[in-house]
Amino acid sequence: MSAQTQRADPARLLVLVADDEPPIRLLCQVNLAVAGMDVLQAADGGEAIELARSSAPDLVLLDLMMPRVDGWTVAEELGADERTREIPIVFLTARATTEDRRRAEKLGALGYILKPFDPVRLAPLVTQVVERCARGEADALRKERSPQLWPADLEG
């Protein structure tokens, strides 16, 4: 399905899920679709960059450890491109170190969700982030550090 077809209903959010694990992509796809969102899937970082540039999703759920191009590089590339720099990024990862979380903050991520995660809570979090960004509240969202979007420091 083309990105234009997926944008046929502008009222529906379009989320790009970039993760090399098919079960994670499927879990996100099902839960976001049930909530009325359209979902694009990328199995590696290179594909994620291409889809973000060609489809302009409302949000990217981004794994860190992917083949070809890792999530860090994807976030850097999207942030450097004027076509994609305003797309909110929420990391969805098993990497739980404080250093990784801080690096995500520096890259401008709006969230850092640890795997395993509660899939039922995913759609409400995505909706919250997209709506707040649409109201110009991205900086406030970064500063709030909601426990649903940012885990507590793990190393003190």
Would you name each region that the model predicts?
Residues 117-127, 138:
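C-terminal output helix
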Residues 8, 131-156:
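CheY-like receiver
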Residues 55-61:
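Active-site beta3 strand of CheY-like receiver
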Residues 66:
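Receiver (REC) domain active-site loop signature in two-component systems and cognate sites
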